[in-house]
Amino acid sequence: MTPLILLHGIGTGPGAWGPQIEALSPEREVVAPDLVGAYASGWEAAVEEVRRLTNQHREVDLCGLSLGGLIALQIAAERSEAGERLIVCAAFRGLPPGLRRRVHAMAMLTRLMPRGFLHRQLVAEIPQPYRNRALAEIAPLGPGKLARLMRQAASARIDTKSIAARALVLCGDRDEANLRLARDLASGLPGSTFALVPEAGHVANLDNAEAFTGLVAEFLAS
């Protein structure tokens, strides 16, 4: 069976995929790489890390949250395997200029934040017991490195027309900052399915793990 690779976002580590690994691994190989070190090295390093991982397989299914979703989109755009499947949550194909400028301004402020305060802000919306683990996992990501990554990710644009994989686009129904972007992404992926994760915010796979995992499992089985 095609392996499933789970890609975490900026404010979490691979431990945030615990509920999905537990639920999905009996049926298939599930891999959740630690991308924090790659994130600390920048966008290209993170993409290359995932590229190396996916190149070990003829076919892979990708599931990414937030920045992990953006990387999943980039990798899917580079691969031509039509039998693969792609699941992204709280991701986008490109930020509008105004929002991109806003993220760049936020990145400038991020550089000035004390490391401990920044990390606590990053994990603030993650439910326990995963919050404390995420706080430990993101330790290598300092303010300067995070600011650079924010600028680079905000400038990324994905050629969705190059994506052959069947796609499921998700977003937490309470993730107001990303709802419009997620819908726009789905509209740019021909034949994709869009679904809201009920009672979930940005970290939808933990906010409502049962609903998120159910949507993913149903899509993979279809």
Range-by-range predicted roles:
Residues 162-163, 169-171:
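Short beta-strand/loop motif that positions the catalytic acidic residue
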Residues 64-68, 72:
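Gly/Ala-rich beta-loop-alpha elbow adjacent to hydrolase catalytic centers
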Residues 200-213:
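Catalytic histidine-centered segment of alpha/beta-hydrolase-like enzymes
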Residues 113-162:
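Conserved alpha/beta-hydrolase catalytic His-Asp/Glu region
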Residues 15-22, 29-63, 214:
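Active-site loop/oxyanion-hole signature of alpha/beta-hydrolase fold enzymes
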Residues 77-78, 83-113:
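Flexible "cap/lid" loop of the alpha/beta hydrolase fold
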Residues 9-12, 66:
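Active-site glycine-rich loops that stabilize anionic/oxyanionic intermediates
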Residues 176-182:
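Conserved alpha/beta-hydrolase "acid-adjacent" motif
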